[in-house]
From Swiss-Prot:
Domain of life, source organism: Bacteria
GO molecular function annotations of the record: RNA binding; rRNA pseudouridine synthase activity
One family name in Pfam for this protein: PseudoU_synth_2
Lineage start: Bacteria, Bacillati, Mycoplasmatota, Mycoplasmoidales, Mycoplasmoidaceae
EC number(s) reported in the record: 5.4.99.-
Gene3D superfamilies: Pseudouridine synthase, RNA-binding S4 domain
Family: Belongs to the pseudouridine synthase RluA family.
Record: active site: 131
Domain S4 RNA-binding stretches: 11-87
Name listed for the protein in its UniProt record: Uncharacterized RNA pseudouridine synthase MG209 homolog
NCBIfam families xrefs: rluA_subfam
Catalytic activity from the UniProt record: a uridine in RNA = a pseudouridine in RNA
UniProtKB keywords: Isomerase, RNA-binding
One GO BP annotation of this record: enzyme-directed rRNA pseudouridine synthesis
Amino acid sequence: MEQTFSVTTAQRLDTFLATLLNLSRVKVAKLIVDGLVSVNGKKITKNGWLVQPEDRVHVNWSEELFEKVPVEVQPYDFPLDILYEDEQIMVVNKPNGLISHPTSFNESESLLGAALFHCNHQPVFLVHRLDRDTSGVIMLAKNQSSLLHLQKQLQQRVMKRYYLALVHFPLDSLSGTISAPLERVGNNKVMWKVGNSSNKAKNAFTKFTVLNQNEKAALIKCELLTGRTHQIRVHLQFIKHPVYNDPLYGLKSEQATEYGQYLHAQQISFIHPTLNKEMGFEAQLDKTFSDKLDNLNLKIANSLYALFQ
């Protein structure tokens, strides 16, 4: 099976492919070293090769490697930042760089695997997911009843999810709603774009509020009104304020680092499935994100909870 991808931002080849293919960098390194990757028709065997905007990256996978097999979640001994836990649910602050759910190449290195290890191999289920390089609040259920209850809240918009996004350039409007349907980019299995009202496009809505901005950048609050793949990242690119360091949807002139996009799931609120009371939790930014805000002189309060009401 062969796939070809277009580069939009300058970055390392292994970082680019790890994001697109949702693989660990160890697995991507093996693909590159084994000679399965070429750039603009030239075989590349160096992981740190820098790809540039408009480069064409071709991956030639073996059929055996692409054989579809069920993915079994393997327990992963990884320290979790648990914000809340009881017999029904877990609320966790997911770190940047950790996938939510295992793929066929990452059976053990996932947040779900870490939760399974923490729960002594007792069943645990993801209520929703976050992209690998998106940090922040993620919720898990410990039984099917709680899972269905919480997923229904997602569908009916009872559950509220708020994100912090660091974007390029100041915004003219300090608040608003982005209404733009999303569809896949051709046959690309990873990237999405704003489409039209065809059958392929899915309605998507994102509310935003500017928290702080200057002549270079803005820190904005985003609320998901729908939950499409890469929704916030594509919507912000669409209004010409792409997320900083986004390897898929960022500025072409920006060389993305391994940290990935500066996007953080800051807060979640929901009705507890058995206690029947409203609960809310907030996840703190990691040091890399906080330092980036300091470097851009975008100060924020120690706690943003009041901003997410």
